[in-house]
């Protein structure tokens, strides 16, 4: 008798019910994964490839013997759909569930642990029964900052992805508040989508897509059209967007190692100009991409001639200074400081590098470090009035900061003192009450002693 037959013949075993009445949810329709819904979920959406899912489950062998349960650990089990993190049956079965749904799954060995099993709890060629509750699911956080959430409707082909500078052909459909505002086929260069009214979030997502992949992208304002919005499409400032994107084809750009020094220097001049255009247009993320290319091409370039070395240093210095300015605009002050450090490594007395590092440190409340940088600016250029003003601002901000700290600590100490006084008062009251009770006991004791002789008479 096979394990599957055993499931059918086990009276009172829910696995038997699934074996007889379950829906085949496999694409091959080979009855490898059977499902019965025990509690209907809500909504219409089900998990997609790459989604993070949160489930509770009980796992049993077909004979009813339990081998695992998330309930025993008092925490949900979390995995990503379609990434091979769980048995095939789960990737298939859980993908059919709605949020809040509870179902029973019966899984044949080829969709579970196969001939190998998972000893000691799961023997070879075991059919498994699961009760699964889908608690929640979320799209894939592509950049791990919540700004781009991907939900994959269709897998792509192969393992190659477009890189920055790749030429891509895509179909896109953009929605905002339920309204379709853009729908078209378009070809463009990754990192330059803005030139075609495509938000930077699409560029970023394309670098993680495969050919023929179809996905839904939820873009936060930072990766959409930002504070400016997009009047052309009727998009308000700081709007959240939803795009459905299909990557039809792409041709990768040359990697750094495929380019010689001459080509890198020629391309550096081109992308520097592109970066400046984006910066002047307030497209700081796009500008970062362009300036970043210069760094990736030239920072680790060795064996240059004197002329090439001079040109390379000039491009790198400009790139680091411009990146620092972009990061200041993007309020990424730590990155701004790092870029200034790189620039000052090339030119320790660079006025812009010192000034921008001072700006970043002032905004990070590093007042002494900022003041030191502005003082160095004056050593380089005593006529820099902005640096003098910034030194005054450092002193003013430091004083205000210290005053706030003083008030904060004073209030803290006052509260501690009041709390200590209250505790001392409570102790004194408790002691007084205790002494009163003791005195009453002593008085009562003396009264009893005095009454004793009268009792005997």
Swiss-Prot record:
UniProt repeat feature TPR, residue ranges: 268-301, 317-350, 351-384
Modes of activity regulation:
Inhibited by both FK506 and rapamycin.
Please state every residue range assigned to the domain named PPIase FKBP-type: 50-138, 165-251
Q: Name one GO biological process term.
A: chaperone-mediated protein folding
- Specify whether Acetylation is a keyword of the entry: yes
Which Pfam families does the protein's record reference? FKBP_C (PF00254), TPR_1 (PF00515), TPR_8 (PF13181)
Where does the UniProt entry say this protein principally localizes? Answer: cytoplasm
- Assembly information from the UniProt record: Part of a heteromultimeric cytoplasmic complex with HSP90AA1, HSPA1A/HSPA1B and steroid receptors. Upon ligand binding dissociates from the complex and FKBP4 takes its place. Interacts with functionally mature heterooligomeric progesterone receptor complexes along with HSP90 and TEBP. Interacts with NR3C1. Interacts with Akt/AKT1 and PHLPP1; enhancing dephosphorylation and subsequent activation of Akt/AKT1. Interacts with IFI44L; this interaction modulates the kinase activity of IKBKB and IKBKE. Interacts with IKBKB and IKBKE.
What the protein does comes down to: Immunophilin protein with PPIase and co-chaperone activities. Component of unligated steroid receptors heterocomplexes through interaction with heat-shock protein 90 (HSP90). Plays a role in the intracellular trafficking of heterooligomeric forms of steroid hormone receptors maintaining the complex into the cytoplasm when unliganded. Acts as a regulator of Akt/AKT1 activity by promoting the interaction between Akt/AKT1 and PHLPP1, thereby enhancing dephosphorylation and subsequent activation of Akt/AKT1.
Q: What is this protein called?
A: Peptidyl-prolyl cis-trans isomerase FKBP5
Q: Which gene encodes it?
A: FKBP5
């Amino acid at each position: 008798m096979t394990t599957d037959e055993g499931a059918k013949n086990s009276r009172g075993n829910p696995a038997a019910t699934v074996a007889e009445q379950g829906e085949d949810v496999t694409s091959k329709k080979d009855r490898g994964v059977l499902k019965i819904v025990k509690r209907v979920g809500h909504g219409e959406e089900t998990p997609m490839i790459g989604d993070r899912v949160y489930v509770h489950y009980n796992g049993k062998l077909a004979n009813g013997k339990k081998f695992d349960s998330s309930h025993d650990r008092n925490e949900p089990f979390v995995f990503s759909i379609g990434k091979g993190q769980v048995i095939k049956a789960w990737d298939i079965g859980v993908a059919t569930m709605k949020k809040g749904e509870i179902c029973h799954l019966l899984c044949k060995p080829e969709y579970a642990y196969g001939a190998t099993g998972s000893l000691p709890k799961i023997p070879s060629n075991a059919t498994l029964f699961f009760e699964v509750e889908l608690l929640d699911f979320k799209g894939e956080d592509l950049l791990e900052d919540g700004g781009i959430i991907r939900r994959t409707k269709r897998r792509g082909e192969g393992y190659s992805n477009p890189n920055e500078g790749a030429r891509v052909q895509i179909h896109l459909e953009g929605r905002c508040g339920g309204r379709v505002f853009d729908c078209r086929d378009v070809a463009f260069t990754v990192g330059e989508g803005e030139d075609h009214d495509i938000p930077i979030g699409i560029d970023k997502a394309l670098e993680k897509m495969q050919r023929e992949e179809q996905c839904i992208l939820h873009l936060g304002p930072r990766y959409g059209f930002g504070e400016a919005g997009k009047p052309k499409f009727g998009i308000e400032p700081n709007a959240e967007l939803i795009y459905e994107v299909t990557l039809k084809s792409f041709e990768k750009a040359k990697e750094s190692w495929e380019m010689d020094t001459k080509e890198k220097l020629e391309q550096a001049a081109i992308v520097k100009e592109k970066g400046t255009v984006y910066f002047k247009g307030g497209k700081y993320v796009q500008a970062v991409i362009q300036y970043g290319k210069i760094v990736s091409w030239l920072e680790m370039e060795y064996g240059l001639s004197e002329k090439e070395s001079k040109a390379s240093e000039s491009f790198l210095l400009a790139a680091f200074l411009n990146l620092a300015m972009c990061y200041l605009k993007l309020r990424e002050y730590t990155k701004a400081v790092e870029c200034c450090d790189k620039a000052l490594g090339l030119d320790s007395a660079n006025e812009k590098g010192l000034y921008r590092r001072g700006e970043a440190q002032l905004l990070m409340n590093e007042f002494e470090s900022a003041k030191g940088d502005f003082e160095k600016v004056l050593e380089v250029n005593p006529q820099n009035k902005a640096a003098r003003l910034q030194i005054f601002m450092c002193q003013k901000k430091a004083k205000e900061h210290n005053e706030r700290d003083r008030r904060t600590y004073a209030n803290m100490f006052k509260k501690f003192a009041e709390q200590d006084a209250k505790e001392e008062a409570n102790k004194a009251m408790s002691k007084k009450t205790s002494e009163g009770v003791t005195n009453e006991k002593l008085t009562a004791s003396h009264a009893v002693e005095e009454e004793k002789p009268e009792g005997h008479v």
